[in-house]
Amino acid sequence: MLIKILEEKLMELIQIVGVIFALFALSRVVLQLKRRSISFNEGLFWIFVWGFVVIFLVFPEFFGYVAEVLGVGRGVDALIYISIVVLFYLIYRLYAKINNLERQITHIVREIAIRDRYEPKKRD
């Protein structure tokens, strides 16, 4: 009996801490949007993600419904599957950004090499 009460209180504590953390993360995203440190689309994505976290923490039974719609056994399974898809998307985005940066660096290095080839070297 006491263990059951403690488990319920612990779950509530975990939910409270999680919501506080998610709201803190949301405030950081909004601050970065105001400073224009991130693009509008990136900000919108992270607002969606952290909002989704808040919904999950406040209404954990919501994922039971999502699991039924997706045809998955449990809500936690649906959460894991959705998380994996989101992580693969983020990995793809990082790959695309790194690939773009590599192309830009290659272009800059080639421009510098061509410029240095035809300009006389200055001696100190």
Swiss-Prot record:
The keyword Membrane applies. Keywords: Cell membrane, Membrane, Transmembrane, Transmembrane helix. It comes from the Archaea. It is a multi-pass membrane protein. Its main location: membrane. Pfam families: DUF2304. The chain crosses the membrane at residues 13-33, 43-63, 71-91. It is found in: Cell membrane. GO terms for cellular component: plasma membrane. To M.thermoautotrophicum MTH137. This is Uncharacterized protein MJ1580. The lineage of its organism: Archaea, Methanobacteriati, Methanobacteriota, Methanomada group, Methanococci.
